C-alpha cells in the first residue's frame, strides 16, 4: 500500500522539479534563442571589432586577484617541495 502511494508522489515531484528548473535565458525564449533582428547588429559589431587595428598588448588594466596569487604561489611551493622529496608529477 505504501509503495502504491509513494510512486505517484515520486513521479509528480520529479516532473515538478524539472518544470520549475527550466532555464529561460534571453527574453523568456526557451533554449536561449534570440530574435533574428538582433543578430545582424551583433555580427557587424564582432566583425568591426576583429578588423580594428587596436593593439591588444596593453594589459595594464588587468590585475590578478590576491586569491589567485595565493593559489599560484601555493602550487609553486607544492611543486618545489615535491621535487625536493623526490616525487615527480606526470601530466
UniProtKB/Swiss-Prot annotation:
The modification Glycine amide is found at residue 31. One of its GO terms (molecular function) is hormone activity. It comes from the Eukaryota. Its main location: secreted. InterPro entries: GnRH (IPR002012). Keywords: Amidation, Cleavage on pair of basic residues, Hormone, Pyrrolidone carboxylic acid, Secreted, Signal. One of its GO terms (cellular component) is extracellular space. It is found in: Secreted. Expressed in the cell bodies of a cluster of neurons in the preoptic region. Residues 1-21 form the signal peptide. The modification Pyrrolidone carboxylic acid is found at residue 22. Belongs to the GnRH family. Teleost species possess three paralogous GnRHs: mdGnRH and cGnRH-II have been identified in tetrapods; sGnRH has no tetrapod ortholog and is thought to be a duplication of cGnRH-II. Stimulates the secretion of gonadotropins. This is Progonadoliberin-1. It comes from Oryzias latipes (Japanese rice fish).
